[in-house]
Amino acid sequence: MRTRQKGFTLLEMVVVVAVIGILLGIAIPSYQNYVIRSNRTEGQALLSDAAARQERYYSQNPGVGYTKDVAKLGMSSANSPNNLYNLTIATPTSTTYTLTATPINSQTRDKTCGKLTLNQLGERGAAGKTGNNSTVNDCWR
């Protein structure tokens, strides 16, 4: 009578490797999308902070209007704390401004939302779209 050998067969190993490959093929892109979505909050925070500083500057400098200079807003850098977004201020008027957070470094992989915008009325935008559409709402949640 033959004794049964212990261990895994080559076929069993191939099946295990295939299952792991399939799981990784699903898990890694899902995780990367999660990281990109969670990093958007940094761009949103950058815009909200800059908007509050714009309003403070506007109220402390009557007759001057809004500024394009981030240094005048008391910001040490135009980049977000983790260097995921860069803040730009479109040429402001005495009564309007538009802030844009442009993704930089690893956040440039965000193809869904891309640039986030915020204006003096509190209107949010994303990927060149403004208003209350699903893309903007998804990007700002």
Swiss-Prot record:
UniProt cross-references to PANTHER family, sorted A to Z: GENERAL SECRETION PATHWAY PROTEIN G (PTHR30093), TYPE IV PILUS NON-CORE MINOR PILIN PILE (PTHR30093:SF47)
Which residue ranges does UniProt annotate as crossing the membrane? 8-28
Its membrane topology is listed as:
Single-pass membrane protein
* Single GO cellular component term: plasma membrane
Instruction: Name the propeptide positions.
Output: 1-7
State the protein's name.
Answer: Type IV pilus non-core minor pilin PilE
| GO annotation terms (biological process) | pilus assembly; type IV pilus assembly; type IV pilus-dependent motility
* Stored InterPro entries: N_methyl_site, PilE-like, Pilin-like, T4P/T2SS_Core
Q: What is the lineage of its organism?
A: Bacteria, Pseudomonadati, Pseudomonadota, Gammaproteobacteria, Pseudomonadales
Q: Which cysteines are joined by disulfide bonds?
A: 113-139
